[in-house]
């Protein structure tokens, strides 16, 4: 066990708070965060900072409200601002974590805190590494938790990360009974797996932390050795060995944290880049990769930007120009008059428009969302933006996209009453 002064002596040279004046402390009420709160309160003058407290009441235990009340009382007694949020929704580890960090971010932005400080220590680091090993995470994610990383409008700082739980002083805190519930993987790792592994190797936790450190150094070295390579330049990228391409692409994807590709999706993406076939390819979560003759880039397209908000009504026995096409809604004829000829079973007006969210077309025994049709057929963003949907009597009767036309499957006993002729207008 260490004293706060000893902890301060080790932390001060790391200059965690050099560029910060107002820092927000995430406090759950457990022994780790209470130690962090007391430590930063005692040494805030020497660190030249002012602190605030952020607490999330998850409302999962009967003690939660009394813990919140205690922290409010402590903050008032010590003249420290405190911010509290009550979790809402269906509880899960991930949902709770997302709620906490969204709350912390909002408080930082609203109240000009430039740093969020959490009480993670080396035992947490070891637990995280083991959990990621169990889940089959990629090598780069075995670097574990970073002591400093960007967050909100500033940084997320973990000053206790080099200390173990046993280094922290005994202090008043609340015991979270849910920490013993084995339905959570972290609790199984902490209470079951790690104790057994430490019986085999008493220094197992130190070994995991050393693994994380060496892994971090390995990837830092890789970045330094490849920083002369422009990853998105197809010529440069394809001059590299397959193994270097693999890690270059992983590095590039670090810039898109919410893309979160699975291993199989990553492999497919790498193959697309290696083939270098020009065009737009959908990835996930509205992300696309665009490949031209010389380079590639990943971009996020907001679905609404795919929609051009204009529409026209085409009446029976009339014609009009819409986008790059000439449409004629005419009585049925034995002769086909247009480049595209669509049989019609109603004389109601036809609405010509862009795709809208939720649009689908019936192909008889099954229907398909038009968005999924675009993805499956690998149409480019430009082709999707210019696609034309024909709607009659509240149903989509055709989709014109790229150089293809997709027709609704008519019922067996429908009687053809008219035809829609479509011709592409020549430019010039």
Curated annotation (Swiss-Prot):
PANTHER family in the cross-refs: TRNA(ILE)-LYSIDINE SYNTHASE-RELATED
Its Gene Ontology cellular component terms are:
cytoplasm
Name by which UniProt lists this protein: tRNA(Ile)-lysidine synthase
One GO term of the biological process aspect: tRNA modification
Q: Is tRNA processing set as a keyword in this record?
A: yes
**Family that this chain belongs to:** Belongs to the tRNA(Ile)-lysidine synthase family.
Natural source organism:
Streptococcus pyogenes serotype M18 (strain MGAS8232)
> What is catalysed by this protein?
cytidine(34) in tRNA(Ile2) + L-lysine + ATP = lysidine(34) in tRNA(Ile2) + AMP + diphosphate + H(+)
Q: Which Pfam families match?
A: ATP_bind_3
Question: What EC number(s) is this enzyme filed under?
Answer: 6.3.4.19
**Which is one GO molecular function term here?**
ATP binding
Primary location class: cytoplasm
- Disulphide linkage map: none
Function, as annotated: Ligates lysine onto the cytidine present at position 34 of the AUA codon-specific tRNA(Ile) that contains the anticodon CAU, in an ATP-dependent manner. Cytidine is converted to lysidine, thus changing the amino acid specificity of the tRNA from methionine to isoleucine.
Q: List the NCBIfam families hit by this protein, alphabetically.
A: lysidine_TilS_C, lysidine_TilS_N
**Residues annotated for ATP binding in this entry:** 28-33
Record note on domains: The N-terminal region contains the highly conserved SGGXDS motif, predicted to be a P-loop motif involved in ATP binding.
Output the InterPro entries linked to this UniProt entry: Lysidine-tRNA-synth_C (IPR012796), Rossmann-like_a/b/a_fold (IPR014729), TilS/TtcA_N (IPR011063), tRNA_Ile_lys_synt (IPR012094), tRNA_Ile_lys_synt_N (IPR012795)
Instruction: Tell me the domain of life.
Output: Bacteria
Q: Does this UniProt record's set of keywords contain Lipid metabolism? A: no
Q: Where in the cell is it found?
A: Cytoplasm
Q: Which UniProt keywords apply?
A: ATP-binding, Cytoplasm, Ligase, Nucleotide-binding, tRNA processing
- Uppermost EC category: ligase
């Amino acid at each position: 066990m260490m004293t706060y002064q000893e902890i301060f002596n080790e932390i001060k040279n790391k200059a965690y708070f050099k560029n910060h004046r107002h820092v927000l402390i995430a406090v759950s009420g457990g022994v780790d965060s209470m130690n962090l709160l007391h430590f930063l309160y005692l040494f805030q003058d020497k660190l030249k900072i002012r602190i605030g407290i952020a607490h999330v009441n998850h409302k999962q235990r009967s003690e939660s409200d009394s813990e919140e009340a205690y922290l409010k009382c402590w903050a008032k007694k010590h003249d420290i601002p405190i911010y509290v949020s009550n979790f809402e929704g269906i509880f899960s580890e991930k949902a709770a974590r997302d709620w906490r960090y969204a709350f912390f971010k909002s408080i930082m932005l609203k109240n000009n805190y430039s740093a969020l400080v959490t009480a993670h220590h080396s035992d947490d680091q070891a637990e995280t590494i083991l959990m990621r090993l169990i889940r089959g995470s990629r090598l780069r994610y075995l670097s574990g938790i970073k002591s400093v990383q960007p967050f909100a409008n500033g940084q997320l700082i973990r000053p206790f990360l080099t200390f173990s739980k046993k280094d922290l002083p005994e202090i008043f805190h609340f015991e979270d009974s849910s920490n013993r519930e084995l339905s959570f993987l972290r609790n199984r790792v902490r209470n079951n797996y790690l104790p057994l592994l430490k019986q085999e190797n008493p220094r197992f936790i130190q070994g995991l932390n050393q693994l994380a450190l060496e892994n971090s150094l390995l990837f830092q070295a890789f970045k330094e050795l490849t920083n002369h390579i422009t990853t998105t330049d197809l010529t440069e990228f394809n001059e590299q060995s397959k193994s270097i391409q693999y890690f270059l692409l992983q590095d590039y994807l670090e810039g898109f944290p919410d893309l979160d590709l699975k291993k199989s999706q990553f492999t497919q993406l790498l193959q697309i880049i290696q083939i270098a076939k020009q065009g737009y390819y959908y990835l996930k979560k509205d992300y696309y990769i665009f490949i031209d003759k010389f380079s590639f880039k990943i971009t996020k397209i907001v679905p609404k930007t795919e929609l051009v908000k204009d529409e026209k009504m085409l009446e029976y026995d009339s014609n009009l120009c819409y986008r790059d096409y000439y449409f004629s809604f005419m009585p049925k004829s034995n002769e086909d008059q247009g480049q595209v000829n669509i049989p019609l079973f109603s004389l109601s007006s036809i609405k010509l428009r862009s795709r809208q969210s939720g649009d689908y077309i019936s192909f008889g025994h099954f229907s398909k969302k038009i968005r999924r049709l675009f993805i499956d057929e690998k149409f480019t963003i430009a082709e999707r933006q210019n696609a034309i949907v024909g709607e009659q009597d509240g149903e989509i009767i055709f989709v014109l996209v790229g150089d293809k036309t997709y027709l609704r499957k008519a019922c067996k006993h429908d009687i053809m009453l008219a035809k829609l002729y479509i011709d592409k207008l020549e430019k010039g």
